[in-house]
Design a protein with these regions (language model features):
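Active-site-proximal alpha-helical segments within enzyme catalytic domains
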Residues: 303-310, 350-375, 432-448
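Active-site helix/loop module of the DD-peptidase/beta-lactamase fold
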Residues: 220-258, 315-354, 371
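Active-site-proximal loop and beta-strand segments within enzyme catalytic domains
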Residues: 161-162, 193-198, 202-203, 218-296
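Classical Sec-dependent N-terminal signal peptides that target proteins to the secretory pathway
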Residues: 1-21
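Active-site Gly/Thr loop motif
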Residues: 333-334, 385-443
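Active-site SXXK
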Residues: 178, 199-226, 250, 307-311, ...
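N-terminal leader/targeting segments and the immediately adjacent pre-domain N-terminus
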Residues: 20-193, 224, 252, 462-466
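Catalytic-site signature segments of enzymes, centered on catalytic residues
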Residues: 185, 197-198, 262-351
Length: 466
C-alpha cells in the first residue's frame, strides 16, 4: 500500500513539473504575442538544451560526471528528485522574472504562501489561462447595461495596499448609497498587463453564492417548490446520501456527508476532486449506497455542484432564459459572463468569470432584491433565517469566511463584530471577496491574485464606518 501511495505521489509530482513547464511556456508565449518584451530575454542555452525535457534526453544534456548540465535544469538544480530532473524546457525565449512555481496545490498558490510580484504576475495570467480549454456556458452582455454613478475619493489605505510590493490586490470597489466611492485597479507596471477593466476574472468560491442566487430565481420561477424540496426526483444522485436531502441542507453545507467528502480531501474513498469529475461518476462509485450522518457544517464544492446541476435539471430548456433574466435583465451586465463545465462532462461547475464592474452589478442586484423584498429577496431572507452555526474555534480578520459565525444558503453570515447588522459575504480562494452591508447599502468587491492584502484595513474597517 505504501509503495502504491509513493507511486501516486511520484506520478503527481512528475505531472506537476511537466505542467509547470508548459504553463511557463504558455506565459512566455503570451508575453511575446502581446508585445511585453521588457519581461523577455533570448534563452542562450536553447540549442544546447532543446528536447532535454523529453524522457530520452541524450548525452548532450549531461556533463561527464553524469549530472545534467546546470544550464539545462531549472535554477541550476542538478539533483534527481522523486519526479526526476527539473529540466528547464524548450523555450527559445524566456522571461526574466523571478517566478516561483508551486506544485502542492496543483495550479494554485498555497494559501499561506506570500509570493513576490513576479510570481503573482505569472499566476494572474495562469488563473485565466488555466480554464481556456474548459467548455463554457456563455451569457452575452445586456443590451442596456447598468451605468454606475461615481463620487470618488482617494482612500490612502486602499491606494497603499494596491500599489505596495507583494500585495496581490487586483481591484477594489466600494459602492455606497448608489455610487462608487472608491475605485482602484492594479497599476499597469504591476499586474496591469494581465488585469484591466474588461478582464473576466475567476470567481473561485464566490461562484457558490452565485449558484444560490440562481437557485432563488429557479424557486421563484416555479421550477423548484421551495428550499425544503427534496432532491429525490433526480436520477443522477439516486442511491446516494443526497437523494432524500432537503435543498436547504445542501445549500447550508450540512448534508451529513462529512464521512465521505471534505474540502481538504475531496472524495475520501478515492481522493478524487469534486471539481474534476462528474456527479454521476461519484454517484456510481464513491457515493454509491452511502447514508447521511448527523447534520454539521462541512464546507466543500460538491454540495454546490449538486445544487447547480439540480437547478439545470429542473429548469430544462428554460435554463438559458433563466440565466439571461438574472444577468442580462436584472444585473444588466456590460461584458460577457460565463461559467465552466467539469472536464469533458456536461456538469456545470460553480466557477464563474466576470469583469470587476460586473461583479459589482451582480452584488447590487442581490442587494436590490433584498431591499425591495422581491420573491428572490424573500428567498435570500429565508436562507438568512435558516442559517447554521459554523462552530469555529477562532476567527481571523483575513477574509469574510473566517470572520463570520454562520453560514446560510452558500453565504457567509453574522460578522463577528457586526452585532445585529444584516451583512452577507461571498468568499473565494485567493482573496476574492464580495461583502454586502444590507442595512447601510454598502458593497465591497475585491479581486485578487492571492491572499495577503490587509483585509482588516480595507474591508473590516470600512464596514465599521457608518
Amino acid at each position: 500500500m505504501r509503495k502504491f501511495s509513493l507511486l501516486i505521489l511520484i506520478s503527481f509530482l512528475t505531472i506537476s513539473n511537466v505542467s509547470a513547464n508548459s504553463e511557463l511556456e504558455a506565459f512566455d508565449k503570451w508575453l511575446i504575442e502581446n508585445g511585453h518584451t521588457q519581461y523577455l530575454e533570448i534563452n542562450k542555452n536553447f540549442e544546447e538544451c532543446k528536447n532535454c525535457s523529453t524522457w530520452d534526453a541524450g548525452p548532450r544534456c549531461f556533463e561527464e560526471n553524469g549530472k545534467p548540465k546546470k544550464q539545462c535544469v531549472l535554477d541550476g538544480d542538478q539533483s534527481y528528485g522523486e519526479s526526476g530532473y527539473k529540466w528547464a524546457g524548450n523555450r527559445k525565449y524566456k522571461n526574466n522574472l523571478d517566478i516561483k512555481i508551486y506544485t502542492d496545490r496543483g495550479t494554485e498558490i498555497p494559501e499561506k504562501a506570500r509570493p513576490n510580484d513576479d510570481t503573482l504576475l505569472f499566476y494572474a495570467h495562469d488563473y485565466i489561462d488555466d480554464y481556456k480549454n474548459n467548455k463554457r456556458f456563455l451569457i452575452s452582455p445586456s443590451i442596456n447595461p447598468f451605468k454606475f454613478e461615481s463620487d470618488l475619493i482617494e482612500d490612502r489605505d486602499v491606494k497603499k495596499e494596491i500599489t505596495r510590493k507583494k500585495s496581490p490586490l487586483l481591484s477594489y470597489l466600494l459602492f455606497e448609497d448608489d455610487k462608487i466611492i472608491i475605485d482602484e485597479i492594479t497599476p499597469k507596471d504591476k499586474f496591469g498587463i494581465v488585469f484591466q477593466n474588461d478582464t473576466q476574472w475567476v470567481s473561485h468560491s464566490i461562484g457558490k453564492s452565485f449558484v444560490s442566487y440562481i437557485t432563488g430565481h429557479a424557486i421563484c420561477g416555479g421550477y423548484i417548490e421551495s428550499v425544503d424540496s427534496q432532491l429525490n426526483d433526480w436520477g443522477a444522485i439516486k442511491n446516494t446520501l443526497y437523494e432524500e436531502q432537503k435543498l436547504i441542507d445542501i445549500l447550508n453545507m450540512s448534508s451529513g456527508d462529512q464521512n465521505h467528502v471534505t474540502e481538504r480531501d475531496g472524495l475520501k474513498k478515492s481522493g478524487r476532486w469534486f471539481n474534476s469529475h462528474s456527479i454521476k461518476s461519484f454517484a456510481e462509485n464513491e457515493l454509491r449506497g452511502t447514508k447521511k450522518s448527523s447534520k454539521q457544517y462541512n464546507y466543500h464544492g460538491l454540495n454546490t455542484n449538486i445544487i447547480f446541476n439540480y437547478v439545470i435539471h429542473k429548469t430544462g430548456d428554460d435554463f438559458k432564459n433563466l440565466m439571461n433574466n438574472i444577468f442580462q435583465d436584472k444585473a444588466r451586465i456590460e461584458d460577457e459572463v460565463w461559467f465552466v463545465y467539469i472536464g469533458n462532462s456536461l456538469d456545470a461547475r460553480y466557477t464563474f468569470f466576470l469583469t470587476r464592474y460586473d461583479y459589482l452589478r451582480v452584488a447590487k442586484a442581490i442587494m436590490d432584491d433584498w431591499k425591495n423584498d422581491t420573491c428572490v429577496g424573500k428567498y435570500l431572507k429565508t436562507i438568512y433565517e435558516r442559517k447554521i452555526n459554523k462552530n469555529r474555534k477562532e476567527y481571523k480578520t483575513t477574509q469574510i469566511g473566517r470572520y463570520t459565525k454562520s453560514y446560510g444558503g452558500q453565504f457567509h453570515l453574522n460578522l463577528v463584530s457586526g452585532k445585529d447588522r444584516n451583512i452577507i459575504g461571498m468568499d473565494g480562494y485567493g482573496g476574492q471577496q464580495i461583502v454586502i452591508d444590507l442595512d447601510n447599502s454598502k458593497i465591497i468587491v475585491i479581486n485578487s491574485v492571492h491572499y495577503g492584502y490587509d483585509w482588516n484595513k480595507i474591508v473590516h474597517k470600512k464596514l465599521k464606518q457608518k
